[in-house]
């Protein structure tokens, strides 16, 4: 369906049997032999005892290696090297046992290969290389397992998103790289990804709110069984209580504010008054340039429009070949993979596409969230403002209640006049890095709408800040290849 700006917008309000297009290669996953767990300790006491026993055994072995007179012909350096090698391997194993990490057949095979390679290298190549590989066998044995996405869960996830209201991040639970943990009844779910032993939760749970507390408890138990530590990114203020009890979560998580949603109250939004003057001027400029807009469902794109929009992607400063983002982005642009996706397209006076915005829907059509805006280099000024304003107008006609434009990261750094020294340093760094991360430019755009909403938080353990920084930065900024 195609709708010109100002015509009713179809948000699939009364169409629960929406088409979900899945990649053709997706099949129901089977448990592979290499993923079979061969050692699993699910008792914390047993983990502590096992780790302590391994450390004691290592100390005893090191004492034998270092002091046994029958090996007096060994050089001191050789005894020390073997002692450190054994200690390193045992330390890796003890840490993995303490964290409750299971050992799969693949882990055992990899550890055996490391050990054999280390012994061979020690005899044939170099002592140091052999010792590193032998120590690495303990590291390979206890390497954390990972969760793998199940594309066939998309219809279930979409049904829960369609039942979730007033959560601007709910549609992004569909992102292809995310795994999902469902409640026992399947009426609620969490989206998450795993990375180097951390389970990073994306946003709030979706679905039946009454199931959220038990869902979080079940998810925490599942994480402990796999030896994963929990991190939550994009948690809303009203859901902080779900993660506040260390007895339930199994660890203490500290909330750190990272920004605020920008949500338009659609029914009451009017571009009138002095404070909207800059927005009105930007929109008016596009009218003067002869810019027009149209709205189309992504799954209903014809070949001509898809080719035109793909050309805009290729000409966009954001890049055409990669996706980025974790908590507040989808992927698969123009693929028609996800249900409920609407595109609003801007054309200049000659009919050439200059830009488009991608919106995801939730709550049976009550909520819309902007995914990613795309525009050509050199597109007329005000294109983004015009696309946002026209989508708000169309959403109002369609009965949409809330429209999320984006997420304003650290708005207090940009909006406050009085800043401390650390805040000034942070703002200066953000200003310098703006060509890469565009936080300051995004804030300048969003403040024209005067629609800052509730805060979002990242929930982390303060004892693991540096490792978590690496994990979160890799999830947000490491590019993923896009297929068009």
Curated annotation (Swiss-Prot):
Keyword vocabulary terms for this entry: Cell inner membrane, Cell membrane, Membrane, Transmembrane, Transmembrane helix
UniProt topology in membrane: Multi-pass membrane protein
Periplasmic side: 69-79, 135-457
Predominant subcellular localization, coarse grouping: membrane
GO biological process, one term: phospholipid homeostasis
Free-text comment about domains: Unlike homologous domains of MprF and LysX that are positioned in the cytoplasm, the MprF-like domain of LysX2 is in the extracytoplasmic region.
Protein name: MprF-like domain protein Rv1619
């Amino acid at each position: 369906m195609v709708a010109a700006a100002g015509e009713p917008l179809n948000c699939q309000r009364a169409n629960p049997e929406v088409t979900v297009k899945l990649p053709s290669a997706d099949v129901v996953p089977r448990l592979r032999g290499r993923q079979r767990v061969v050692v699993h300790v699910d008792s914390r006491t047993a983990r502590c005892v096992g780790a302590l026993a391994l450390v004691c055994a290592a100390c005893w072995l090191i004492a034998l290696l270092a002091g046994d007179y029958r090996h007096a012909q060994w050089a001191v350096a050789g005894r020390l090297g073997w002692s450190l090698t054994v200690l390193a391997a045992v330390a890796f194993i003890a840490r993995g046992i303490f964290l409750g990490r299971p050992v799969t057949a693949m882990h055992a095979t990899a550890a055996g290969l490391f050990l054999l390679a280390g012994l061979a290298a020690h005899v044939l190549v170099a002592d140091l290389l052999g010792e590193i590989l032998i120590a690495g066998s303990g590291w390979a044995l206890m390497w954390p397992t990972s969760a793998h996405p199940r594309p066939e869960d998309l219809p279930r996830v979409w049904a829960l998103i369609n039942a979730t209201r007033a959560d601007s991040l709910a549609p992004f639970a569909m992102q292809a790289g995310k795994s999902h943990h469902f409640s026992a009844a399947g009426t609620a779910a969490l989206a998450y990804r795993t990375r180097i032993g951390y389970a990073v939760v994306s946003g709030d749970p979706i679905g039946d709110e009454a199931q959220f507390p038990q869902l979080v408890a079940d998810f925490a138990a599942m994480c402990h069984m796999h030896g994963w530590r929990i991190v939550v990114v994009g948690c809303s203020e009203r859901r902080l209580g779900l993660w506040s009890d260390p007895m339930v979560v199994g660890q203490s998580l500290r909330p750190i504010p990272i920004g605020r949603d920008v949500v338009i109250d659609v029914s009451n939004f009017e571009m009138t008054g002095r404070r909207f003057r800059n927005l009105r001027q930007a929109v008016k400029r596009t009218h003067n340039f002869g810019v027009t807009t149209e709205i189309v469902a992504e799954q209903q794109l014809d070949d001509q429009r898809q080719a035109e929009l793909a050309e805009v992607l290729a000409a966009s400063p954001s890049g055409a070949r990669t996706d980025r983002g974790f908590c507040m982005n989808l992927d698969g642009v123009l693929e028609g993979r996800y249900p409920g996706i609407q595109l609003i397209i801007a054309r200049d006076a000659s009919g050439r596409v200059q830009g488009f915005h991608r919106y995801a829907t939730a709550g049976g059509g009550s909520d819309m969230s902007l995914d990613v805006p795309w525009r050509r280099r050199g597109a007329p000024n005000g294109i983004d403002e015009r696309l946002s304003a026209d989508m708000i107008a169309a959403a109002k006609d369609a009965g949409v209640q809330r429209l999320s434009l984006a997420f304003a990261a650290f708005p207090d750094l940009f909006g406050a006049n009085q800043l401390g020294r650390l805040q000034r340093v942070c703002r200066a760094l953000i200003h310098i890095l703006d060509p890469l991360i565009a936080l300051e430019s995004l804030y300048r755009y969003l403040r024209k709408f005067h629609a800052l909403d509730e805060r979002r938080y990242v929930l982390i353990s303060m004892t693991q800040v540096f490792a978590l920084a690496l994990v979160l930065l890799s999830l947000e900024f490491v590019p993923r290849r896009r297929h068009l």
